Structure formats: structure tokens, C-alpha cells
């Protein structure tokens, strides 16, 4: 699609002289900016800001919002992303003045309520994960991964075990896992999956050695399958002197049923913006706390939030700490939302979350298994992976199926991931969707499968009803246009 066919940018709508807002007359004396800044930092021409009336601005952004799609708009079965509904009570609590209007440089004594919430959230996450301590510093999932790996690295270095330079990662893992390991200074070793979609324990035994720093796992894995040999894998890694790292992306499948710490994991990161209903989107903020077992506590990033007597305080006395990984809690509001969710649901409610998430995924999988290939035909957890290989033989690719779903007001599932499944379609319904919504999506998927057989062109040319059709996604990824540049 040509850019000329898209909605004009607010800069392109600008008409010189249009006024959208009136400011009161300034009561501050004018001053010369050159008295305070070097000439190199002063503008030679006015800033090219858009000039529009208030009505034009309102219509522009309202029209843009109508072309967005989110969880509040419709079903969003994006596999491995846990796009569950975000309860609006979370928003109400996050907007309490005592939470919304505080500043990071306030004295601890003036923000005891906020610190108490953070401390109680840490305590709740310790209980949910089976860890011994939790830090809320990491900003999001991948940041949590990197932080956890840096703790493991610091642990080995403290023990003089500098030969441990390798992190083992399954071939079905999230792409952030090898990326985080590389950024943390480790070499990545891949362990294969077996014919059941689980980690091949025999292959794990081959790749584990004296140079193993850690094994990173998601359980259930990215195929939505529970790694039933997890205890044996933990024993193998620990016997070799390595650590077991838990990617918490799929915690929604086991929450309040089983704890990573009880499986043998030493480090865990969580995604509060997924499992615990902090909203997705807009590039953040997220929240990626990490939990650790006792022997890794000395290496936690400082300051560590603690409770002394009846007061909450930040403790900097951790000489082996990896240091700060983020200066402030700019994502405090996400933590408030997660805490509200945990307190609202309670232990029994969190258990129901897991049960319904797993039930919904298995229901959908069984309803779709005859129309699409099911690479691993077994009980899944919170998500499942289909394959569009059958449709590919008819000339319809998985990307076509995803685009066709847009015509039915459904966000597409995750596609072409995990990489070990050809034409992968990864579906995660979450626990918050009704049976009626699931049935509607199932009927649409069955209809698309039939169209692939009888009228493939309608699928190949989809979407037909969206404002934007098919973009050059390869060019967008390789040569992105990220800012407006005025034509001269």
C-alpha cells in the first residue's frame, strides 16, 4: 500500500495560522535564551510544530483511535503474550492521588504507603513463585531475563568459576532468551526438542558440562506443553554446577497450582503486564520482577526494599550486588495494578485463572484439530500450536489466514513461532474470554479453512475490510520510517 493512501500525519494537516489552544498572558519577564545557552544549542528557525484547530486535532486523533485494536475491542489470542482483560478497578486504584502524585526523590518517610505496597507485592510474588526473595527493579520481561542472568554470572564469578560461559536454551524458546544471554556475555548452546515437543533429556545430558552457567526454560514451554521431566533436568544442571532459570512468560498456565521454586528453579522472572493484568501496548511500561533462591540474594540489584521495625526502607548494603539496573520505579503504576489484581483474586481466584486458561486452550485445540494440523497431539496448558501446512499445499499461507481473521474483527494469533513448527499458528485464549467468544473464533477459523479449499483467493488477498491492507513488512523492518521529515 502506498503511503499516499494512508491518513495524513498531523504535521501534514498543518495550516499556518491555525490555533488550537489559547494561553494566558505570561506574567514572567521575557529573557534571552542566549544568556543561558551556548549558540550551538539555540534554534536558528522556529520549531516546525503542527498548527491546527482544536476540532481538527480532536477528529484526527479520534479517527486514529478508531483504527486501533486492543483487548477492549475484541478477542486477542496472541500466543505467548497472555492478552487477558485488564480489570478497570486496577486503573481506579493506580489513579489514587497518593500513588499517582508522588515523586521518586521524596523522602522515604513521606511515601511509606507506596513502599508498603511494593513490599507486599514482593512478598506475594515470593509466595506465588516459591522463591526466597524478589526484586521489582527490572522494567519488563527481557530486562528481567538479563538481570537474572547477570545475577547468575555474578554468582559464578564470586565463586571463581569463570569457565562457566555457556547458557543452554531449548530450540523452542522465546527469541529474547538467546538475546538476553548474549547481552549478558554468555555463549548460547541449543538443546533439541524430542518428538513430543519437550526438551530432549538425552540431548541435555550431552550439552551440559563444566562450562554450563545455566539452563533457561519456559514451563510450560512455547508449544504450550508442560515439561514433565523438569525435576530430572534440574538435577542434571545442578549436578554440573549450573543454575536453572525460569522464563515466566507462561506462568498463567500454572499459577497457584505449582511453583517454579518447587521444580528446582534458582531464578525466575515474571511479566506483571501479562500474567497480572498490567496493560500491554504503547511500548510500555511493563514490569519484569525477578525472584531468586537464597544463595543468589547477595547479588540482587540495589537498593533492596526491606522492612525494618515498622518502616519500609531501601537497603544499599549489598557489597556483592550487581548494582542498579534501573534508577527509579517509573513503572510504579503497573506494580499497583498487579498488586490490586492479586489482592482482588486471592489464592483461590488465581487458581481459577489457571484452570480456565488451560480449559479454554484445550477446548479450542480440540475444536480445531480436524481442520488444521496439530503437530503435538496431547493435552496442552494455556496455549497451543497449530500448523497451516495443510493449507499451504492449497496455496494459502499462515500469514493469509492471519490477515483473513482481521476481516472478522479478530486479532490474529502469533504466527511462524515457535520456529520448530512449520507455518505455526500459536493461540492463547486466556481465562477471561467467554465460551461464546471462543466459539465465534473457532467458527471463523473453520470457515477460513473451508475457504482455503474452495475459494483460496479470498484468503490470499485478505484483509478486505480494514483501513490498511497489506504492507511491505520486510521493508518496514529493514528500512523503518520512524519520524516525520518535511519536504523541502
From Swiss-Prot:
Entry keyword Nuclease: no
Instruction: Name any GO cellular component annotation.
Output: cytosol
Q: Which residues carry this modification: N6-(pyridoxal phosphate)lysine?
A: 274
GO biological process assignments:
glycine decarboxylation via glycine cleavage system
Which cofactors are reported in the record for this sequence? Answer: pyridoxal 5'-phosphate
Q: What is its EC number?
A: 1.4.4.2
Matching InterPro entries, A to Z?
GcvPB (IPR023012), GDC-P_C (IPR049316), GDC-P_N (IPR049315), GDC_P (IPR020581), PyrdxlP-dep_Trfase (IPR015424), PyrdxlP-dep_Trfase_major (IPR015421), PyrdxlP-dep_Trfase_small (IPR015422)
Q: Does the keyword Ribonucleoprotein apply?
A: no
Catalytic activity reads: N(6)-[(R)-lipoyl]-L-lysyl-[glycine-cleavage complex H protein] + glycine + H(+) = N(6)-[(R)-S(8)-aminomethyldihydrolipoyl]-L-lysyl-[glycine-cleavage complex H protein] + CO2
Q: Which keywords annotate this record?
A: Oxidoreductase, Pyridoxal phosphate
Which EC class, in a word? oxidoreductase
Which positions carry the signal peptide feature in this UniProt record?
A: none
Q: Which Pfam families match?
A: GcvP2_C, GDC-P
Q: What does this protein do?
A: The glycine cleavage system catalyzes the degradation of glycine. The P protein binds the alpha-amino group of glycine through its pyridoxal phosphate cofactor; CO(2) is released and the remaining methylamine moiety is then transferred to the lipoamide cofactor of the H protein.
Protein name (database record): Probable glycine dehydrogenase (decarboxylating) subunit 2
Q: Which organism is it from?
A: Listeria innocua serovar 6a (strain ATCC BAA-680 / CLIP 11262)
Q: Which gene carries the instructions for this protein?
A: gcvPB
Amino acid at each position: 500500500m502506498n503511503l499516499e493512501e494512508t491518513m495524513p500525519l498531523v504535521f501534514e494537516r498543518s495550516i499556518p495560522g491555525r490555533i488550537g489552544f489559547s494561553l494566558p498572558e505570561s506574567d514572567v519577564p521575557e529573557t534571552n535564551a542566549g544568556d543561558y545557552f551556548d549558540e550551538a544549542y539555540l534554534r536558528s528557525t522556529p520549531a516546525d510544530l503542527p498548527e491546527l484547530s482544536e476540532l481538527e486535532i480532536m477528529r484526527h486523533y479520534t479517527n486514529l483511535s478508531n483504527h486501533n485494536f486492543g483487548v477492549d475491542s475484541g478477542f486477542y489470542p496472541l500466543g505467548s503474550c497472555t492478552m487477558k482483560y485488564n480489570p478497570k478497578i486496577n486503573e481506579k486504584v493506580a489513579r489514587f492521588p497518593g500513588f499517582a502524585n508522588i515523586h521518586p526523590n521524596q523522602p522515604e518517610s513521606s511515601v511509606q504507603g507506596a513502599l508498603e505496597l511494593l513490599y507486599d507485592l514482593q512478598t506475594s510474588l515470593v509466595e506465588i513463585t516459591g522463591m526466597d526473595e524478589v526484586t521489582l527493579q527490572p522494567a519488563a520481561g527481557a530486562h528481567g531475563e538479563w538481570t537474572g542472568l547477570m545475577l547468575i554470572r555474578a554468582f559464578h564469578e564470586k565463586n571463581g568459576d569463570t569457565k562457566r560461559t555457556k547458557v543452554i536454551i531449548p530450540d523452542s524458546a522465546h527469541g529474547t532468551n538467546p538475546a538476553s544471554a548474549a547481552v549478558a556475555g554468555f555463549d548460547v548452546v541449543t538443546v533439541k526438542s524430542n518428538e513430543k515437543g519437550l526438551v530432549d533429556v538425552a540431548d541435555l545430558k550431552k550439552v551440559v558440562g563444566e562450562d554450563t552457567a545455566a539452563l533457561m526454560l519456559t514451563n510450560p514451554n512455547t508449544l504450550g506443553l508442560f515439561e514433565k521431566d523438569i525435576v530430572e533436568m534440574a538435577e542434571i544442571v545442578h549436578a554440573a554446577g549450573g543454575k536453572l532459570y525460569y522464563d515466566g512468560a507462561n506462568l498463567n498456565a500454572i499459577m497457584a497450582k505449582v511453583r517454579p521454586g518447587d521444580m528446582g528453579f534458582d531464578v525466575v522472572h515474571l511479566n506483571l503486564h501479562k500474567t497480572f493484568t498490567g496493560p500491554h501496548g504503547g511500548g510500555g511500561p511493563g514490569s519484569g520482577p525477578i525472584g531468586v533462591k537464597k544463595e543468589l540474594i547477595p547479588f540482587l540489584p540495589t537498593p533492596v526494599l526491606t522492612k525494618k521495625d515498622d518502616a519500609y526502607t531501601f537497603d544499599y548494603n549489598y557489597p556483592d550486588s550487581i548494582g542498579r539496573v534501573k534508577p527509579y520505579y517509573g513503572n510504579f503504576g503497573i506494580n499497583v495494578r498487579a498488586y490490586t489484581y492479586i489482592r482482588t483474586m486471592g489464592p483461590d481466584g488465581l487458581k481459577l485463572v489457571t484452570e480456565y486458561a488451560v480449559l479454554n486452550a484445550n477446548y479450542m485445540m480440540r475444536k480445531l484439530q480436524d481442520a488444521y494440523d496439530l503437530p503435538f497431539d496431547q493435552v496442552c496448558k494455556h496455549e497451543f500450536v497449530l500448523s497451516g501446512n495443510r493449507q499451504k499445499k492449497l496455496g494459502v499461507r499462515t500469514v493469509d489466514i492471519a490477515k483473513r481473521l482481521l476481516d472478522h474483527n479478530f486479532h490474529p494469533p502469533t504466527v511462524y513461532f515457535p520456529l520448530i513448527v512449520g507455518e505455526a499458528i500459536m493461540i492463547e485464549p486466556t481465562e477471561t474470554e467467554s465460551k461464546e467468544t471462543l466459539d465465534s473464533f473457532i467458527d471463523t477459523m473453520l470457515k477460513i479453512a473451508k475457504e482455503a479449499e474452495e475459494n483460496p483467493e479470498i484468503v490470499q488477498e485478505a484483509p478486505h475490510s480494514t483501513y490498511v491492507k497489506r504492507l511491505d513488512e520486510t521493508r518496514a523492518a529493514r528500512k523503518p520510517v520512524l519520524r516525520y521529515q518535511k519536504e523541502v
